[in-house]
Amino acid sequence: MLDELGQKIIKELQEDARQSFREIGRKLEISEGTVRNRVKGLVKNNTMKISAIPNPEQLGFNFMCVMCIEVKVGSAERVEQLLIKSPNVYFICGCTGTYDIIGIFVFHTPKEFDEFVKNVIANIPEIVRTSTFVAMHISRSPWEHNLDVTELCKS
C-alpha cells in the first residue's frame, strides 16, 4: 500500500514532473534526499513511472478509435504481440466478454486507418471479427488528467 508521503510525492510529480527533488522537498517540508530515495523506491517497485506523455492530436493523429477484437481460442496473446508492433497502437489489453482484446489506435486520417485494417488486421488469421468505435471527442485523456492517487488510496 502506498503511504501518505508517497502519495504526496506522486501528486507533486503529476503536477510538474520536471521540478527538482529539492523543490518537492521544500513543498512537502522534507529533505531532498528523502524525496530522491522515495522516488527511486517508487520507480524500482513499479509503483510509478516517470515519462513524457505525448498528445496524439498535437502530433497530427486526428483519428482515434477503439477496436474490440475477437480471436480464435488460445491466440489472444499472439495477436496482442503482433498488434503492439504497430506504431498506431496507443493502448491494448486482453479482456473478458464477447471480445478478447480491446485496443485504442491513433491515425493521421481515416484513410490511414483503412490501410491499417486492410494491411494489418486482415492479415492476422487468428482474428475472427472486430468491432470499431471512432472517437468523436475525448473527454478525459492521460495528457490532461492524472489519476488522483490520494483518492484511489482511500478506497
Identify the role of each PLM range.
Residues 1-155:
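A compositional/biophysical signature of low hydrophobicity enriched in polar/charged and small residues
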